[in-house]
Regions:
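Non-transmembrane, aqueous-exposed alpha-helical and coiled segments at domain scale
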Residues: 1-108, 114-243
Length: 243
């Protein structure tokens, strides 16, 4: 459900319907995620699962109070990322290397996850990523939709790539959105979400490399975007999405 909005309908989702999980059948149960309100969700998971929860890694905003005990919290910056964001992502990457088919993993993405879940792609520096956000969103006022069409493709985790890391495990993907009537996404089903998604990074991405280049061209900033970013975008198949 969206707060003050219409209900999400899972029509068209091949996995629609209630699912039962025998939590005693899993060797480990982890939580990973990022967002300004992610601790509220993770605390609820901790409260429900108790000792069945092994641990996990989440990234929150600097200044957030500590609400969770079993899951490790890394603090990062929003709206422009910092080294804390990268450190938290590296911890998620490290955790993913230990995951097996006998594990259950909750992924949780909340508002602010696009900044907090920042792990620059090979050849891209954190400073490059910061400059993209500063230029496009802070200076030029580009919408988050158009900004993410760009930064989803210069990152190791955004744009659904988080799912690949934990694909060996059984996954439960929780998507949170704090929306109001002024930002009502309307009646949304699964197929529309997958096609249009640009900010829920534990759902397949709906943006493309071609869309990223179009956004840069639209704002006439080819010469201002870091050269490493332009090289990466131009080297990829134009129509490919992140996942």
């Amino acid at each position: 459900l969206t707060v003050g909005g219409k209900q999400f309908e899972a029509d068209g989702d091949p996995d629609t319907g209630a699912t039962d999980y025998d939590i005693t059948s899993f060797q480990h149960i982890y939580v990973v995620g990022a967002g300004k309100g992610v601790q509220l969700v993770v605390k609820a998971i901790e409260d429900v699962l108790g000792d069945y929860l092994t641990g996990g890694e989440i990234i929150c905003k600097h200044g957030d109070p500590m609400l969770v005990k079993k899951v490790h919290v890394t603090m990062g910056s929003h709206p422009t990322p910092d080294h804390g964001c990268v450190e938290g992502c590296q911890r998620i990457l490290n955790l993913s290397s230990r995951i097996t088919e006998n594990d259950l993993v909750f992924t949780v993405i909340m508002n602010g996850g696009s900044s907090l879940l920042t792990c620059p792609a090979d050849g891209i520096t954190l400073e490059d990523t910061i400059e993209v956000t500063r230029l496009m969103q802070i200076e030029l006022g580009v919408t988050t939709r158009k900004l993410n069409a760009l930064r989803n493709h210069i990152d190791k985790l955004k744009g659904g790539k988080l799912l690949r890391l934990f694909s060996r495990a059984t996954l439960i993907n929780l998507c949170g959105a704090d929306l109001n009537r002024a930002f009502d996404i309307g009646k949304t089903d699964f197929q529309y979400l997958v096609k249009e998604n640009y900010w829920l990074h534990n759902v397949p991405d709906g943006t493309t490399y071609e869309g990223a280049l179009q956004t840069i061209k639209e704002f006439n900033v080819e010469e201002r975007i870091p050269a490493s970013v332009m090289r990466l975008l131009r080297s990829q198949s134009p129509e490919n999405a992140s996942l």
